[in-house]
């Protein structure tokens, strides 16, 4: 299979480049407005590169005219550009593999469905946490518990801290209109996995929301989840990790920080084998993140995450 890519200079692009290479396929061409794409030398030094979208599209059209089919477009760009870049790929006759979240507004999912139908191509969302070995094992354990007690509600605490420097607040990520905010950036994959494991949303609250952290309580069909996401190193406590991602279920801790290296490769394998996750799979977590983004903050209570109960002056 031949691939094209938009955003080959982005921080997430190497995971996609490795997945394309390690599944035995080739990157024909890529586009990025920035030309710091030396990473291509490691994976596909012979691929074409463009900094102008019109030149990129012209190359795609010429390739098609010559009978060279470019099958997939990988989208590795900032979140607010995803819809336009997915539409670009479909319009140019490619299936699209896009970083999570696919879009910020759930109403755009239906628009993408219409475009899929129009162009007869698929849009795939990367939901790597669903493929994590601990998630798969947990899915079986939860099923077993619910077989015994269909009304069971699991008690869960999630803490996700990913330390970022001052650059973050000058980047597109700090703009909620472009990134969706921390609950979307850090949470959409986790929310997707929780919905996959524990069922639909019954209620939700936000207990703390600041530029560097957000947290609340999520009530699902089979889980009560207190959650907290942060980019502030002061929230790390004594831990020395750059990324801290922990889930505690009924007192048992699951470390979701490890073993991520192969999840993108496995995601690509499944997509290329006519599997993968589509628009319907992505919808629930995008809708939840959108709704959380539009909630007012409620005072924390005894059910809230401990870090939601601390004031900034207490850190």
Task: Spell out what each predicted region is.
Residues 6-7, 31, 76, 126, ...:
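Short hydrophobic segments within beta-strands
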Residues 49-115:
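Beta-loop-alpha module in the N-terminal Rossmann-like domain of NAD(P)-dependent dehydrogenases
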Residues 60-64, 72-74, 270-315:
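C-terminal helix-rich "cap/oligomerization" subdomain common to oxidoreductases
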Residues 103-166:
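A contiguous active-site-proximal alpha/beta segment in oxidoreductase catalytic domains
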Residues 166-235, 280-287, 308-309:
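Rossmann-like dinucleotide-binding domain that binds NAD(P)(H)
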Residues 216, 242-251:
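Short polybasic amphipathic segments
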């Amino acid at each position: 299979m031949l691939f094209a890519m938009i955003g080959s200079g982005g921080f997430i692009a190497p995971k996609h480049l490795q997945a394309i290479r390690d599944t035995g396929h080739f990157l024909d061409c890529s586009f990025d407005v920035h030309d710091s794409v030396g990473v291509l030398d490691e994976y596909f030094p012979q691929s074409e590169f463009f900094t102008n979208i019109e030149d990129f599209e012209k190359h795609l059209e010429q390739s098609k005219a010559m009978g060279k089919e470019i099958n997939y477009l990988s989208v590795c760009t900032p979140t607010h550009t995803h819809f336009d870049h997915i539409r670009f790929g479909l319009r140019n006759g490619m299936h699209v593999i896009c970083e999570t979240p696919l879009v910020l507004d759930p109403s755009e999912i239906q628009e993408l469905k219409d475009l899929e139908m129009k162009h007869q191509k698929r849009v795939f969302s990367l939901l790597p946490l669903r493929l994590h070995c601990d998630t798969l094992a947990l899915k079986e354990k939860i099923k077993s518990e619910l077989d015994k007690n269909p009304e069971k509600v699991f008690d869960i605490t999630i803490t996700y801290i990913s330390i970022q420097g001052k650059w973050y607040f000058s980047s597109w990520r700090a703009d909620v209109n472009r990134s969706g905010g921390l609950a979307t950036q850090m949470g959409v994959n986790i929310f997707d996995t929780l919905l996959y494991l524990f069922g639909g949303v019954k209620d939700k609250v936000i207990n703390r929301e600041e530029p560097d952290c957000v947290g609340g309580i999520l009530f699902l069909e089979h889980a009560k989840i207190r959650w907290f996401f942060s980019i502030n190193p002061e929230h790390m406590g004594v831990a020395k990790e750059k990324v801290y991602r922990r889930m505690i279920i009924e007192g048992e801790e699951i470390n979701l920080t490890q073993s991520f290296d192969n999840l993108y490769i496995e995601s690509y394998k499944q997509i290329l084998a006519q599997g993968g996750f589509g628009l319907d799979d992505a919808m629930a977590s995008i809708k939840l993140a959108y709704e959380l983004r539009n909630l007012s903050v409620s005072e924390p209570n005894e059910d809230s995450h401990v870090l939601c109960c601390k004031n900034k002056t207490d850190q």
